[in-house]
Amino acid sequence: MKKEIKRDDVNVIEKDFGNNNSIILKLFKKFGEDSFFIQTTVTDIIVLWIDGSLLLALAKFLLTINNPYNMLFDLYGIDERMRLYKHNLPLSHFSVVYHFISINRNSDIILKIALLEEKLSLPTLTKLYPNANWYEREIWDMFGISFENHPNLIRILMPKTWVGHPLRKDHPARATEFDPYVLNKYKEDIEMEALKFKPEEWGMKKNKQSKYMFLNLGPNHPSAHGAFRIILQLDGEEIVDCVPDIGYHHRGAEKMGERQTWHNYIPYTDRVEYLGGCINEMPYVLAVERLAGIEVSQRIEVIRIMLSELFRINSHLLFISTFIQDVGAMTPVFLAFTDRQKIYDLIELITGSRMHPAWFRIGGLAHDLPKGWNALLKEFLLWMPKRLLKYINVALKNSILISRSKGIAEYNKHDALLWGVTGAGLRATGINFDVRKKRPYSGYQNFDFEVPIGAGISDCYSRVMLKLEEIWQSLAILKQCLENMPEGPFKMDHPNTTPPHKVRTLQHIETMISHFLKVSWGPVLSSNESFKMVEATKGINSYYLISDGNTMSYRTRIRTPSFPHLQQIPSVIRGNLISDLIAYLGSIDFVMSDVDR
């Protein structure tokens, strides 16, 4: 395969990839330089195109080297057929992207495989990385790319009766592009039949000595935390096996990114994980700013952090209180909603909205901080510590809660990495990986805070207690924001993001023309690929954006933490009781919009 950077130009490799160049040299030595095409992007990640025949050998190599790339962070497809600016990339109609992370190295590597329409097929990675299962099903569902020897390659987000593959460029993006939908008795029977669970399709076989029951938990069960179904194979109350069934909340968030301008997509980011608010806006605007070459002021960075930590506390309070409710105590829910109201009052004062502010902007913020924000924040910082002690004393030290959650739904660091677990679930296993510390963004490196780490085993109780500790750390960050808010602009003076100053419009007609085009059409960003991850409320959230020199994204990939977390459920809960499953679901901290997108 053609190379963009030659092996003997080590200086170029070091300049582009810094400390990560060692893995490139190892790959060159093992597989030969001609096996790779190095793509230059603004992702700050090694991006290598390879032939599909090398995939299994390369993945095994990455998984078994010293300090291995033992997390398959993301896996997704791209329809390359309408892409204008390919920059001499390998010929492809579609491509499949594998994003690996080495926690020990704090390093990423992305492998891309070019596919032609005549052969849309690759070998499955499920035997090496078990979390590839759902990602490969999603690629089949969205693009029609198959994976050889996959254990059960069926749709995952779309209904079984759906026709077509939605993320292909020739698939309609709007409801008005379809024929009018009519639901008659015949169609209803077909849809209901498609929802029936058939155990034999999943390799679930009856034992002659045991009479198993198959039970639907959800998609409207209160302990399922949303439109989510788990099919349980039961021997009495013991869970022999289970199959999580998702997709009921799918709204096509990635497809929408292909139809909205760079600015207009911001409100959609809030709704991917509807409790995270501004945290969800952060990776998107940072990725777009990287594409546009925009650097923001320190004031913007600190305000973004302040809003993110307010939403983090807000989400954690809901998680902790509803977990306690799931195992049998009601009082903390009422305490939490009182505390969350105080946070929403502050968020509403600053942004004008509550749950979905859509307040971050490319290159800044919607507006500056209002008068009185600091007094309200100070009041909250005085209030919250006393309330946290109440949660601990009233519920989290309760012997019944501890017995219902400690030692329940356990997994270790090896399993967490192979299943793609991030956030508190990963840190509870003893792995110290918080993006705010390991890969600081928006100025987090200037703040003094600790990352709570578990003792080595992640169980229901440790996951909850880590989230509680994270609230204390978020309060410490907010205090620093209050005491050290820098001066400066709330929006950068950049033609792609900000209207020109009045004085310039009276002197230079070009500024008016530029303003008219940027407002009416949207900003045009140069062709490139960008990536940004953040430590969100439920784990690592990231955006991979492809610009094709247009006013909107060519491909918007949203990696959410809850998707792999739900995929892990069967491996953790087999052999446990139904009551343990309820506690486990409550300890994951997920919302279905984050899973289904």
Swiss-Prot record:
Region (NADH dehydrogenase I subunit D): 211-597
Gene Ontology MF term list: NAD binding; NADH dehydrogenase (ubiquinone) activity; NADH:ubiquinone reductase (non-electrogenic) activity; quinone binding
SUPFAM superfamilies in the record: HydB/Nqo4-like, Nqo5-like
GO-annotated cellular components: NADH dehydrogenase complex; plasma membrane
A Pfam cross-reference name: Complex1_49kDa
Chain residue ranges for the region called NADH dehydrogenase I subunit C: 1-188
EC numbers on record: 7.1.1.-
Major subcellular location class: membrane
PROSITE patterns, per database record: COMPLEX1_49K (PS00535)
Function: NDH-1 shuttles electrons from NADH, via FMN and iron-sulfur (Fe-S) centers, to quinones in the respiratory chain. The immediate electron acceptor for the enzyme in this species is believed to be ubiquinone. Couples the redox reaction to proton translocation (for every two electrons transferred, four hydrogen ions are translocated across the cytoplasmic membrane), and thus conserves the redox energy in a proton gradient.
Subunit composition and interactions: NDH-1 is composed of 13 different subunits. Subunits NuoB, CD, E, F, and G constitute the peripheral sector of the complex.
UniProt name for this protein: NADH-quinone oxidoreductase subunit C/D
